[in-house]
Amino acid sequence: MDKERNAHQIVRKDGKGCFVESLNDSFSIGRCHLAFAAYDLNRPAGERQANLVQIYLDCGELLELCRKAESGELLLRLQDKKQKGDKTPLYQCMGGTSAEKLHRIGRPRPDGKSLSRIFQLLPGNKSDFLLVADSGPGETDEKGLIVPRFGKQPENHVVISLSMGHFCELLLLTRAHYLAWLTASYSRGEEKAFHTQEPEQIPTEPQEPEMAMF
């Protein structure tokens, strides 16, 4: 899996005992794949991964984040929140995989629940941003959205601190690869850039439609 992941890697940003990497393996389903991992170097080789959260951002939302970063809007919002001591997210994405889909692909949770995933972009203290990724049990509501049911105790939790520059590199390099993929798709004469039906196999873990908050 590590070799496959490195082959798909666009960019990786490291923090203390953790990293986030952007992967190009989900453009065909309209998603930008961010993998958050935490590790413990004191563990034996091959057992060092402590937490892993897979986040799939809608490609349109990634482009909107890029627009806000390039226009200076994101910086202004960050400065305003820091001046006011506002710790609420600058951006939040809630998604996951339903219990039914997990069962269908042979990855049911032991508790039979859905898998909830949350990504948040928060104002940092010592740096510009905190990127927070959590996953744990969830429930599917009547609208088909995955509602988290882990409170303040997620099963997997990864936090990475990034400067404005490093976060923009993550965004803009991912956008560059996505736009290159779109160009290649159209140049091959593909009728549509995205699959009209959900593929049988989705990289790593499939996602239900996600709800984002800017």
Residue ranges and their predicted role:
Residues 22-45, 128-143:
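A short, structured beta-strand/loop element
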Residues 59, 71, 76-100:
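Negatively charged, low-complexity tracts enriched in Asp/Glu with abundant Ser/Thr
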Residues 87-157:
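Short, solvent-exposed interaction modules
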Residues 1-27, 203, 208-212:
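An N-terminus-focused feature that recognizes amino-terminal "leader" regions
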Residues 134-214:
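Mixed-charge, glycine-accented linear interaction segment located at domain edges/termini
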Residues 52-72:
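Compact, glycine/acidic-enriched structural inserts
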Residues 38-58, 144-159:
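A cross-kingdom feature marking solvent-exposed beta-strand/loop segments within repeated
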